């Protein structure tokens, strides 16, 4: 029996799709990422200030102890969220984002926390939470992840990680994250990626009035 050659290619389709999913975000030059749409210049400046503050910590690592300066900065927040002093051994992604907000002078619109889920709750209380599929974030927004693959394909579970949106380009989002593989570094994800739990949206416009 003669098998048409095109049917022999079918097993390769999942591999090709997986390769596109994994490698495509990593092929976009960093300078391409930016604002998906225009915002007032004063708001743009505030958002850029937070992003620049976070990105200045790129390369900070646990193994050489350089992340401790970020933890120390977070622990100067008064009062400390939950009254808890973060240790150098704790997961520090949320502390990273909160320390960046402190350094940028934006704690009045960005709720500080060392817990991803408690920070989500704080954004929700401020009515600054968004989890609709297709949301287009801006630089300076907070992106929360849930790494547990959702059985219903609707990511509404427990958030294990958070980062700060650096910018978007087409279907991609570039993020600066603390405690990404134990250091501070960039991640590029697909907009609508299954692992995105939602976004905390600081009210930058309120500081520009």
Functional labels for PLM-detected ranges:
Residues 7-10, 14-44, 149, 153-209:
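Aromatic- and glycine-rich peptidoglycan recognition patches
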Residues 8-13, 69, 76, 118, ...:
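Terminal low-complexity, poorly structured segments
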Residues 24-106:
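N-terminal capping segments
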Residues 59-64, 69-72, 114, 138, ...:
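Intrinsic disorder/low-complexity signature
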Residues 74-78, 124-130, 184, 193:
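Solvent-exposed, flexible loop/coil residues
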Residues 107-182:
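...with weaker cross-activation on analogous glycine-rich loops/strands in unrelated enzymes
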């Amino acid at each position: 029996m003669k098998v048409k050659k095109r049917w022999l290619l079918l097993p390769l389709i999942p591999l090709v799709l997986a390769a596109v999913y994994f490698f495509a975000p990593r092929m976009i030059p960093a300078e391409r990422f930016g604002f998906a749409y225009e915002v007032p210049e004063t708001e743009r400046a505030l958002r850029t200030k937070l992003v620049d503050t976070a990105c200045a910590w790129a390369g900070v690592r646990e193994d050489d102890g350089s992340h401790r300066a970020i933890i120390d900065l977070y622990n100067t927040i008064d009062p400390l969220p939950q009254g808890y002093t973060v240790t150098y051994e704790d997961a520090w992604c949320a502390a990273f984002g909160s320390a960046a907000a402190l350094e940028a002078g934006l704690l009045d619109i960005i709720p500080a926390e060392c817990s991803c889920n408690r920070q989500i709750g704080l954004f929700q209380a401020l009515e600054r939470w968004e989890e609709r599929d297709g949301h287009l974030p801006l630089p300076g927004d907070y992106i929360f992840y849930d790494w547990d693959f959702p059985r219903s394909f609707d990511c509404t579970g427990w958030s294990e990680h958070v980062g700060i949106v650096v910018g978007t380009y087409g279907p991609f989002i570039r993020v600066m994250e603390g405690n990404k593989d134990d250091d501070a570094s960039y991640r590029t994800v697909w907009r609508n990626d299954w692992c995105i739990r939602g976004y905390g949206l600081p009210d930058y416009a309120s500081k520009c009035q």
